[in-house]
């Protein structure tokens, strides 16, 4: 079931360095929110704070709040592993487990958490997840083949199937199409439009045309200056951001004057 994300006053630090400063936003359920901005502006760093993935980097910490349907994901009694089950992540490059079959890749989340599945239960999860990622018809007769044997676009859809297999509420996607060809990119974009019926989706993209095509809401990030932190400049309905932004900085980026 899709959930709402409320972020208030979020600062992200790496050691003493302030990487992202004072971000507040609401991300509505069953919608696609795109983060755009030039390289190094903090959009991917901020994305990782939404499921605590930034914590795998030594010295990373946050100040502020991230609420998932009113539950503070940074509360002392909250397990980061549970947060990452609830808020899944799809990375820039397809990363199926190379030694695992397509079948085992899909249920990897259950195995990593030492959850035993009956064969019938595992079969149901695999088919449901692969259908959800629009991949079932292409691989149903070769589920025992390595995940790495698939094409790049298929591998990325396999990674999406793996993410939705554990039934998250939110899917984070960090430039999921940047390593893919145009046909595979179109397949992923079509899939995103379908997935938003059941999930809250947040996507980082360098491709403004992609943001315009797939998202309902767009957030523009930019650096406050050389050596300064990234900041949220403007967030709003995608059509408005691309046709009538409120901030001059946003307009300059959208029209290609910088970035």
Curated annotation (Swiss-Prot):
Please cite one Gene Ontology biological process associated with this protein. phosphate ion transmembrane transport
Occurrences of domain ABC transporter (ranges) = 5-248
- Kindly give the InterPro entries that the UniProt entry links to this protein: AAA+_ATPase (IPR003593), ABC_transporter-like_ATP-bd (IPR003439), ABC_transporter-like_CS (IPR017871), P-loop_NTPase (IPR027417), PstB-like (IPR005670)
Which cell locations does it reside in? Cell membrane
Binding residue positions for ATP: 37-44
Q: What is its EC number?
A: 7.3.2.1
- Keywords recorded for this protein, A-Z: ATP-binding, Cell membrane, Membrane, Nucleotide-binding, Phosphate transport, Translocase, Transport
Tell me what reaction this enzyme catalyses.
phosphate(out) + ATP + H2O = ADP + 2 phosphate(in) + H(+)
* Pfam name, any one: ABC_tran
A single Gene Ontology MF term assigned here is: ATPase-coupled phosphate ion transmembrane transporter activity
- Segments traversing the membrane: none
The answer to whether keyword Protein biosynthesis applies is: no
Membrane topology reported for the UniProt record: Peripheral membrane protein
Q: Which GO terms describe its cellular component?
A: plasma membrane
Q: Could you tell me what this protein does?
A: Part of the ABC transporter complex PstSACB involved in phosphate import. Responsible for energy coupling to the transport system.
Subunit structure, as described in the record: The complex is composed of two ATP-binding proteins (PstB), two transmembrane proteins (PstC and PstA) and a solute-binding protein (PstS).
Membership in a protein family? Belongs to the ABC transporter superfamily. Phosphate importer (TC 3.A.1.7) family.
Q: What is this protein called?
A: Phosphate import ATP-binding protein PstB
Q: State the organism named in the record.
A: Thermobifida fusca (strain YX)
* Encoding gene per record: pstB
